[in-house]
């Protein structure tokens, strides 16, 4: 696993690659998707049980694709934060194009330092949609979240994790995980570490599961093929499929318990 990742690396990465992500993924940068963006976001909103009137934080918002779809469907107030100036510019343009300036506010900032930007006990819901994996220190990210989420607030994390290691064959996971970290500016964790961090910070996990929708990896595979990114030894063909052993996509829903 890459150990020297810092938040500046992530900023530089997305300043360079955001246009390419938009070209390949559209406005939702997620490797695990389903048959349509609307279906994906409806699924996530239903799992969280988003309701009108909620105050929501989109932590690591990309170009605000998910938040725009949520704000179109619900009467909510969304604060969105990205580390990238380029993503901020795209987000503002997208929000304006969809006439959602009264529902979504986006800023450039570091989601490890949320109290610099937001009031205490502000949010009913916080979500990280394949964004916490960019954190050099996920414990610091969740600790920062404690300052701004309400007691009883809901936290949703959809992310990729290191798969279970095969005894005597650690390189089976080590090589692709290291390659993914290096190529996509990530620091992939085990699910056990993230669950421990949540427990230490006072979150009660309501569910932890593989997302229950038809899994589609076409955009991620097309992106890596287009840019000739090789993540497997002797790779010949798509690197993502439903039978991966070195990666595990999971969703977590937790409540701020204390």
Where in this protein do the model-derived segments appear?
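Short, glycine-/aromatic-enriched active-site segment of Class I SAM-dependent methyltransferases
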Residues: 161-184
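Short alpha-helix
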Residues: 186-201
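Conserved alpha-helix/loop element of class I SAM-dependent methyltransferases that forms part
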Residues: 34-52
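N-terminal, positively charged/glycine-rich alpha-helical extensions of SAM-dependent methyltransferases
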Residues: 1-28
């Amino acid at each position: 696993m890459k150990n020297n990742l810092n938040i500046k690396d992530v900023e530089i990465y997305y300043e360079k690659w955001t246009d390419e992500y938009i070209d390949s993924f559209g406005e939702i940068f997620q490797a695990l998707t389903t048959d349509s963006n609307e279906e994906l976001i409806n699924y996530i909103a239903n799992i969280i049980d988003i309701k009108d009137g909620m105050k929501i934080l989109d932590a690591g918002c990309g170009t605000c694709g998910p938040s725009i779809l949520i704000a179109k469907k619900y009467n909510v107030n969304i604060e969105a934060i990205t580390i990238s100036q380029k993503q901020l510019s795209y987000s503002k343009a997208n929000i304006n194009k969809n006439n959602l300036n009264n529902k979504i506010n986006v800023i450039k900032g570091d989601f490890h330092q949320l109290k610099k930007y937001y009031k205490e006990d502000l949010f009913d819901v916080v979500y990280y949609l394949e964004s916490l994996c960019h954190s050099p220190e996920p414990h610091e990210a969740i600790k920062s979240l404690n300052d701004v989420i309400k007691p009883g607030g809901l936290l949703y994390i959809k992310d990729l994790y290191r798969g279970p290691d095969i005894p005597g064959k650690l390189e089976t996971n080590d090589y692709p995980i290291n390659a993914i970290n290096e190529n996509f500016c990530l620091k992939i964790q085990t699910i056990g570490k993230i669950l421990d961090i949540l427990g230490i910070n006072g979150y009660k996990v309501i569910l932890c599961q593989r997302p229950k929708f038809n899994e589609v990896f076409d955009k991620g595979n097309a992106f890596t093929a287009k840019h000739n990114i090789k993540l497997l030894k002797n790779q010949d063909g798509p690197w993502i499929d439903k039978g991966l052993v070195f990666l595990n996509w999971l969703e977590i829903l937790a409540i701020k318990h204390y």
